[in-house]
Amino acid sequence: MFFDTIAAISTPLGTGGVSVIRVSGNNSITEINKIFKGKNLIKAKTHTITHGFILNKDQTILDEVLISVFKTPNSFTGENVVEINAHGGILITQMVLERILSLDIRLAFPGEFSQRAYLNGKMDLIQAESIMDLIHATNENAIKIANSGLQKYTSQLVTSLRDQILNLIAQIEVNIDYPEYDDIPQITQQKIALEVQSLIKQLENILSHSHKNRYLKEGIKTLIIGRPNVGKSSLLNAFLNENKAIVSDISGTTRDFVEAYFNCRGFTLHLIDTAGIRKTDDPIEKIGILRTEKMLLQAELILLVLDQSNYLQEEDIQLLQLTQNYPRIIIGNKVDLKSDKLISSLCDYSSQLTPQEIISVSSLDKTGFFELQQTILKKFQLNDIKPKDFNYFSNARHINQIQIALRSFQDLQQALLQSMPIDIYSIDLTKAYQALGQIIGENQENSLIKELFSKFCLGK
């Protein structure tokens, strides 16, 4: 329970038609009523709008407003909430806020409204974090994932798993505490092993879908790599339909990263055009090449660009070897020049690399770009997304807790194989139960809660 009343501007600060100032706290209606000229807000019914005026200290009119009243417990925060719709000028909005703060009301911290909603039981931690995800969504799929969290689909996943674990713990504890009762179902190691295996499969399925959702939400970090002058920058520009990167016949034009985002049928490619890798004496170009090599370790996808109009060069072969253990797609650029030099030399280079593995494209006329996008979608299993696929996690914190729970079950499997005493099994089950509970905010440390909500906007 909170005893102070808070206020903040909820709309972006700028010139517009309307700005909204949100006030929350058990005394919010009483306090705002002191500076309001119009019908008595204390007598207003919940979820109603009242027209009137905000008054200055000298009782002159500051602004004409519409005030929405939401009474506890049926409000966003669970407290009495007042939302003041003022005119949308920067100065007038600030003046209305200052007038509100002259009362027994303080400025809210970032995310404090959502934090109060969580602490007052109006939402769980997944829903609170989904609000942030919705605000910061950069593509349509990210919005769908966030809405799934708000509708508690992911919370229900956690609740179902925890119910199964709790039931198993209860069976074990009853058998330990009351072994003499014949009417209690006997729990055997075989039965525990079957239950644990089922839970592991469920967690692995959740993780598989959640990793996919992370790509849908955050995008795929995609490194465009190749020797100089194979058309890496042209490829980036073709993706974006604009001249983002400098294109030149002079080798080594790109010396640092050029980053851009491309919406590929609902999900985001975080494209990074890199310095061409080759032997060079240019100190600045050397730095760019070293940074490119380091970026390989961080990339989720590598687009290795080769020149289809030319035979394989020594640098091409080095890059093929360097990236063979990374997630990559090999692109044969400049297909518009209608040359098969690259294909013929590939056959000589390696029997393991076939022409079918090369996606032939033209950055000039965009030939092959549809096939390239399809290949990327298939590689990350994003080519057949169904509505139910959004009902999984995408937040790194949630995925980490799922992994902790999974490791606890894997430890339990080892204990079962060693036929350890039955009371030992409850330890790993409890660890998994607690790890999943932290996803929805159960038994969370105050420091973590504060950190999570501090990332929210002011007024949210």
UniProtKB/Swiss-Prot annotation:
Keywords: Cytoplasm, GTP-binding, Hydrolase, Magnesium, Metal-binding, Nucleotide-binding, Potassium, tRNA processing. InterPro entries: G_TrmE (IPR031168), GTP-bd (IPR006073), GTP-bd_TrmE_N (IPR018948), GTPase_MnmE (IPR004520), MnmE_dom2 (IPR027368), MnmE_helical (IPR025867), P-loop_NTPase (IPR027417), Small_GTP-bd (IPR005225). Its cofactor is K(+). It is found in: Cytoplasm. Transmembrane segments: none annotated. One of its GO terms (molecular function) is GTP binding. GO terms for cellular component: cytosol. This is tRNA modification GTPase MnmE.
